[in-house]
C-alpha cells in the first residue's frame, strides 16, 4: 500500500491500494467514467454504507455535468484505469452524500428507471423531507462526518465513443440536438412509425424543458422555448391520435390552451380528439374557434365537420341497433313445460306471440380516419 497522497485539495487524502495501467486518462468534459465504489464510515469497524458491487452494476458519471457529489469527479480524475484507491474525505465534501446515497438505493430497488447514473435535477427537493427513509442516512444527515471512499476505475470513454443521453448534454448541445430530434420525429411520422416518432418528440421536449428551468418565466428566452415546446407537444399529440390515445391528446391540448388560448393548432388537434370520442359539442366548439382565429382554415374545418357528422351518424346507428338487439332478446318467448295434469277449469290459453324477427345483419362502416 502506497503512503497517503494529498491531491492538493483541502480535506482529501488518497491512498493507492492497487496500481492502475497505462497513462492517466484524458478526462475531457463529456467523458463518461465507469467505476465501482464502496463508502465507509471512519469508525473502528469501518462500517460500510454503500457498495456498488452488491448492486451488481458499476456506476458512471459524466465529467463536467455538475455531479451531485462534486468531490467524486476530483477523486476519479486522479486515477488510472484499473487503479483501486482509498480516499479519506472531510466533512466539507461529504455533507450531501446521504441524499446521493438515497437516490442510489432507490435506483437499486428499481424505483428509478435511470439505474445507476444520477441526474443533477431535483436535488433541492430532497431537503423538503424530514427523513430520507433510511435510518443510517438520517443519522449522517443530522451529524455530517468524514467518509472513506474505495474506488476502482473501470473505464473512461471519450464523448465520441458512446451514445450520450440527452440529459447528459450541455445546454449548448441540447439546443443543437432539438431540431435534429424534431426532424427525425417528422420523418418517422411520415413513414407511419408513430411510436418511434413520439419518442423523438418526447426527447426534444425534455431537452427544452430542462433549458427552460434555467430561464425566468414569461421573459423573452423562456417564451421562445415555450413556443418550441408547444410545437413539439402538438406533434406528439398527432402521434397519439394515430395510436388512438385520444384522452391523452385532450389532456395535453387542454393544458396548452389554458396557458396559451390563441394557439390555433391546439384547438384543431383537440377537436379531432373530441370527434374520436363522440364529444360532438366540444368538437364543434373547437372547430368554430379555429375559424375565428384562422379563417383561411375553412376548408379543413368543413372536412372535419363532415367527418364528425359521419361519425355521429354511425354512433347513432350503432346505438339504435344495440337497443333493437336488447329489445329483441327481451321479447324472445320460451314455452315452459306443460303441467302433468292441467286443472280442469283452466281454459286454453291463446298462443303466445312469436318471437320478434332478429335484426338483419348490418355491416358498420368504420369511421373515416382523420387526416394528419
Curated annotation (Swiss-Prot):
Transmembrane segments: none annotated. Signal peptide: none annotated. GO terms for cellular component: cytoplasm; nucleus. InterPro entries: AIP/AIPL1/TTC9, PPIase_AIP, PPIase_dom_sf, TPR-like_helical_dom_sf, TPR_rpt. GO terms for molecular function: peptidyl-prolyl cis-trans isomerase activity. Keywords: Cytoplasm, Nucleus, Repeat, TPR repeat. Residues 53-145 form the PPIase FKBP-type domain. Its main location: cytoplasm. The lineage of its organism: Eukaryota, Metazoa, Chordata, Craniata, Vertebrata. This is Aryl-hydrocarbon-interacting protein-like 1. The gene is AIPL1.
Amino acid at each position: 500500500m502506497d503512503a497517503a497522497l494529498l491531491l492538493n485539495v483541502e480535506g482529501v487524502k488518497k491512498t493507492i491500494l492497487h496500481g492502475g495501467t497505462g497513462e492517466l486518462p484524458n478526462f475531457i468534459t463529456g467523458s463518461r467514467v465507469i467505476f465501482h465504489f464502496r463508502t465507509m464510515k471512519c469508525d473502528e469497524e469501518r462500517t460500510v454504507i454503500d457498495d456498488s458491487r452488491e448492486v451488481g452494476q458499476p456506476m458512471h458519471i459524466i465529467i463536467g455535468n455538475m455531479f451531485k457529489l462534486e468531490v467524486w469527479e476530483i477523486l476519479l480524475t486522479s486515477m488510472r484505469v484499473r487503479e483501486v484507491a482509498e480516499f479519506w474525505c472531510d466533512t466539507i465534501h461529504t455533507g450531501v452524500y446521504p441524499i446521493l446515497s438515497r437516490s442510489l438505493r432507490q435506483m437499486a430497488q428499481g424505483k428509478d428507471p435511470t439505474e445507476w447514473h444520477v441526474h443533477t435535477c431535483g436535488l433541492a427537493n430532497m431537503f423538503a423531507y424530514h427523513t430520507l427513509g433510511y435510518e443510517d442516512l438520517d443519522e449522517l444527515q443530522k451529524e455530517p462526518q468524514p467518509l472513506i471512499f474505495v474506488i476502482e476505475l473501470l473505464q473512461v470513454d471519450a464523448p465520441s465513443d458512446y451514445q450520450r443521453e440527452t440529459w447528459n448534454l450541455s445546454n449548448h448541445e441540447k439546443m443543437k440536438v432539438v431540431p435534429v430530434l424534431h426532424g427525425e420525429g417528422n420523418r418517422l411520422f411520415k413513414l407511419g412509425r408513430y411510436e418511434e416518432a413520439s419518442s423523438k418528440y418526447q426527447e426534444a421536449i425534455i431537452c427544452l424543458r430542462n433549458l427552460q428551468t434555467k430561464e425566468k418565466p414569461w421573459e423573452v428566452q423562456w417564451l421562445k422555448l415555450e413556443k418550441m415546446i408547444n410545437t413539439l407537444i402538438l406533434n406528439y399529440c398527432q402521434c397519439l391520435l394515430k395510436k388512438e390515445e385520444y384522452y391523452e391528446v385532450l389532456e395535453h391540448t387542454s393544458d396548452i390552451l389554458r396557458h396559451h388560448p390563441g394557439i390555433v393548432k391546439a384547438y384543431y388537434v383537440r377537436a379531432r380528439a373530441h370527434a374520436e370520442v363522440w364529444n360532438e359539442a366540444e368538437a364543434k366548439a373547437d372547430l368554430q374557434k379555429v375559424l375565428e382565429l384562422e379563417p383561411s382554415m375553412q376548408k379543413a374545418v368543413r372536412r372535419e365537420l363532415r367527418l364528425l357528422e359521419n361519425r355521429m351518424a354511425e354512433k347513432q346507428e350503432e346505438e339504435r341497433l344495440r337497443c333493437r338487439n336488447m329489445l329483441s332478446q327481451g321479447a324472445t318467448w320460451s314455452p315452459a313445460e306443460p303441467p302433468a295434469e292441467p286443472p280442469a277449469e283452466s281454459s286454453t290459453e291463446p298462443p303466445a306471440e312469436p318471437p320478434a324477427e332478429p335484426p338483419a345483419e348490418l355491416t358498420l362502416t368504420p369511421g373515416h380516419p382523420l387526416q394528419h
